[in-house]
Every structure is written in C-alpha cells, then in structure tokens.
Amino acid sequence: LTFDNGPSKYTSSLIEQLKKREIPVTFFVLGENVEKFPDTLKFAYDTGNEIGIHSYTHKLFTKLKEEEIYEQIEKTNTILNNLIDKVPTLIRVPYGTRDEKIDKILSNVHLTDVLWSVDSKDWKLKNTNRIYQYVMKYIKGNDIILMHDTFKTSVEAAILIVDKLLSECYTFVTISEYIDTKEYVENISDITTLK
C-alpha cells in the first residue's frame, strides 16, 4: 500500500489507524508538503513506515530540464535528510511518466523508480465507498496499490481496504521489502552524486 503527494492534514490520522493495525506503508512524499508538515513526516517514519521521494512540487519530469529534475530530487532529499537523518533510495516519478533522460538521472542518483499495479483513482473518484469498491474490484494479490493521503475520502477508503484485506489474510509490506532493496542510505552524498 502506497500513498503519494503528502504529507497532508489527513496523514496523521491515517498513520494512527495503520499503527493500530500494525500495517506498514510507503509514503512517496512531496518536499513542499514535508516542509508544511515536518512533524507528520517524522511521525510516519518513527512508526515504521517507509519514506520515498515523489518530487518537490509534483511537476511532470518529462517537461523539465535535466537540472530542474536534479533540483526536484536534491531539494526533497535535503529536507528528508534533515528530518530523519537518512535519504530514501526509492522514488515514484510524478504521474509515473519517464523517458530515457529521466532513467539516466535516476540511475545517476541511485534511485529506484516504483510504479503501481492498482491505481485507486482516489484523486478522481473522491468518494470513500467508490474508491473502496474500485480497488477491491482490481486487487489480485502481490499488488502495489496507489493512493493519496491528501484526500479525506482516500484515507477513509484506505482503512476499509486494509480491514477487508486483513480479514482475507493478506499481508502488507513496504516497497523495499517487496522488491528486496535497501530503503535508505545514511549519507546524502551517497545518493546525490551528479552525472
């Protein structure tokens, strides 16, 4: 289970509910929102959730110049490093859109891009029950579910989805566990070596 675009005013409530259920998730965060909700980001990390990069401002990378993409990544890395003393190795590129230029940049900064297999369409549906029904229709197991912790309806639907899947004996893991990779590096210079 993954969440993009946060943290937001709804994220702490989501974390509390997930903590009660002992469910770890991966948050792909926007640097500009981490600046607005630093305590929420720290709470997410401290409660065993994984933090990945989404970008700083959610701009479409394919429309940016190379140096602008590096800036989106580096700025977010610096913010996260200052808060949790670590730098993520995972990124979800905004809109999931990549090209050769982006692949090269991600390789240069040692980031693994993570897409999804089930898009909850929560950004479009904006109704708790419709989001829940939509995800349950497409879930097969071993899925990476994309949700957004920036909508109250998404957070409510996420808890319904978690409870239903737990009742069906599903297990939840972070992305780094799922793809068997290291989730963080200790030194920011290890990941931001340019070109």
Cite the ranges covered by each PLM segment.
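Active-site beta->alpha N-cap acidic-glycine motif
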Residues: 1-64, 68-82, 86, 171, ...
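A cross-domain feature marking catalytic cores of carbohydrate-active enzymes
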Residues: 3, 29-31, 53-55, 93-95, ...
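Conserved, mostly hydrophobic/aromatic
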Residues: 4, 18, 51-54, 76, ...
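Active-site environment of divalent metal-dependent phosphoester hydrolases
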Residues: 8-10, 35-36, 58-60, 97-101, ...
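C-terminal domain-boundary segment and adjacent tail
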Residues: 20-21, 34-35, 153-195
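Non-membrane alpha-helical structural segments and their capping/turn regions in soluble enzymes
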Residues: 66-71, 129, 152-155
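His/Asp/Glu-enriched short active-site or ligand-binding loop at hydrolase and phosphoryl-transfer sites
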Residues: 87, 97, 103-138, 170-182
